[in-house]
Amino acid sequence: MGLLDDPRNLEILAEDNVRTLKIPNAKLTPPVAVILVGIPAAGKSYLVENLTRAFPLAVLSEEEMLKFLAPRISFFERAQEEIFALSLKTIEKLIQRGISCIFDYSVKKREDRALIKQRVEAYGGKFILIHLQVDKEEAYKKLSQLNNEVSRGERKGVIMNKDLFEYEVASTMLPSSAEPSLTFRSGDPESLRTVVDQISRITAR
């Protein structure tokens, strides 16, 4: 039986996952859930690092959740589905406890983002979506550099080839006009300051 086949199992795993997180002492009222969407090498980790310096946010990491789930995932093809299920339930539990969070992961599907928004707002939180903008060629150049670092053992990670990069780009559903979002432009310090200011205004309402 897989993680998604037993809701009780998911509840227990989400509680265990919350205990693995670094929870900030300070709190935003109401709590917020910051969700990201962008193609590979768009600067997600850089943005997460800077936003956690500016705001009290617990970080949900795709990489850490994959490690957490590794012994339990029923088969490889369900990995992404199970990571999303665990992340959604974990976000719910954090918001219920008044803990703000950021998901260090590109939530590619609009329906998944809509579901997170629905759950966050149902528990009294605020949903903030950030679109990470980057030129495709620039992103692939950066990705190639990261791949080289991984192959030389200078960085941990998985090498993403051109075909997989193109698949990720094609399958990423960017926010539509009906899906309000903030915009972060990779490599633009002023864009980072703007996003921080915008989140400050949202959390002050």
What are the roles of these predicted feature ranges?
Residues I39:
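P-loop (Walker A) phosphate-binding loop of NTP-binding proteins
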Residues E149-V196, R205:
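Small-molecule kinase domains that catalyze NTP-dependent phosphoryl transfer to phosphate-bearing small molecules
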Residues I23-P30:
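Phosphate-binding P-loop
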Residues G2-I23:
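N-terminal pre-Walker A segment at the start of P-loop NTPase domains
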Residues A42, Y46-I99:
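Conserved substrate/cofactor phosphate-moiety recognition/catalytic segment
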Residues Y123-L143:
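Conserved phosphate-donor/acceptor-positioning beta-strand/loop module used by diverse small-molecule
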Residues A79-F127:
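Glycine-rich phosphate-binding loop used to anchor ATP phosphates in small-molecule kinases
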Residues L36:
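Hydrophobic anchor at the beta1->P-loop junction of P-loop NTPases
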